[in-house]
């Protein structure tokens, strides 16, 4: 290796260059003359004669890079340390230095090393064609940043895709107890989007304006239920706040904030998806989850009878009737000859 490096350092220049600040031409060896050029590489680059082509300028810059590389290798071997970063800007094969002659090979799709990120290495080509940049490390850092940015974009999109596919399964079957019949059965849960679509499609068209649920109201309802309110077999349990849930002495029910006031949720659901309700009509639950079930099939409508209310309010009338029943009738079957005995 040492002999090869020595030959490389003493390789004569094939062409001569006229540079400002230097007398004569570069007709010596890299070991003796190029050191003077490396001290002020930008000046040397800017003072190249216009008679030379871009290819000659690239070869000139390549010779300077080769000399730098050989000097770094020599210093590293003397110190007994190896730093891979010194060679990161060059070819992976340290013996094949001539591969850098054709810079345009970086964009060759046949080159597997650069085929996937050829656009990111565009700055490497611009480096050889530019008169203002001479540091390969700066160009490599830009290319690395571009690659990292692309990887970050792909990682972000992949993460978003994973989050979006979390709801790809519309139905999830799980086993829960059915309180209406005391048996354990399976029921299918739905995501909020399916429940929301179902509510929109099945809302009655002639709902009174004061009871009609709008889109935002339906969205809020979907947040706190995970099954259909139209299920014929299972209860639809409300998972939000329940009034008097910890007070067994009072009835439990769900208050829904509707048009700046609290309204019983089961009345809203019945009015929007079954039939309108007036102020004299009431609902009762026919399942075990009274007050917390949102299944419209578990509601029964009824209203108080006026006669029953009157009877309950006037219990004295019943006492008079009982006194009349104590009358004893004695006599024949002929109604004209009936005798009433008041004891």
Swiss-Prot record:
Please indicate which superkingdom the organism of origin belongs to. Viruses
Q: Where is this region: Disordered?
A: 1-25, 62-119, 169-188
**What ranges does the record list as Acidic residues composition bias?**
83-107
Q: Where along the chain is composition biased (Basic and acidic residues)?
A: 72-81
- Give start-end positions of Basic residues composition bias: 62-71
Identification of the protein by name: Uncharacterized protein R328
């Amino acid at each position: 290796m040492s002999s090869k490096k020595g030959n490389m350092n003493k390789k004569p220049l094939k062409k001569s260059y006229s540079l400002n600040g230097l007398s004569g031409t570069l007709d010596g060896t890299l070991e003796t003359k190029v050191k003077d050029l490396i001290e002020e590489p930008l000046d040397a680059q800017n003072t190249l004669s216009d008679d030379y082509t871009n290819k000659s300028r690239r070869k000139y810059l390549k010779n300077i890079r080769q000399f730098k590389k050989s000097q770094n290798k020599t210093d590293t071997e003397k110190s007994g340390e190896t730093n891979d970063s010194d060679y990161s800007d060059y070819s992976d094969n340290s013996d094949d230095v001539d591969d850098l002659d054709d810079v345009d090979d970086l964009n060759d799709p046949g080159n597997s090393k650069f085929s996937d990120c050829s656009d990111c290495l565009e700055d490497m080509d611009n480096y050889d064609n530019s008169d203002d940049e001479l540091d390969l490390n700066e160009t490599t850092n830009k290319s690395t940043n571009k690659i990292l940015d692309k990887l970050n974009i792909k990682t972000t999109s992949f993460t978003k895709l994973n989050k979006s596919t979390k709801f790809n399964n519309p139905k999830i079957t799980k086993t829960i107890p059915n309180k209406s019949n005391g048996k354990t059965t399976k029921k299918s849960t739905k995501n909020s989007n399916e429940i929301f679509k179902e509510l929109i499609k099945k809302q009655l068209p002639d709902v009174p304006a004061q009871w009609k649920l709008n889109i935002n109201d339906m969205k809020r309802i979907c947040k706190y239920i995970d099954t259909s309110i139209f299920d014929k077999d299972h209860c639809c349990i409300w998972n939000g706040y329940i009034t008097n849930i910890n007070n067994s002495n009072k009835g439990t029910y769900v208050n829904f904030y509707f048009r700046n006031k609290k309204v019983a949720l089961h009345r809203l659901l019945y009015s929007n998806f079954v039939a309108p309700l007036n102020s004299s009509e009431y609902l009762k639950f026919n399942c075990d989850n009274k007050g917390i079930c949102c299944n419209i099939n578990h509601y029964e409508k009824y209203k108080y009878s006026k006669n029953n209310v009157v009877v309950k309010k006037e219990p004295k009338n019943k006492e008079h009737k009982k006194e009349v029943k104590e009358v004893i009738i004695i006599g024949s079957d002929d109604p004209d000859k009936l005798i009433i005995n008041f004891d």
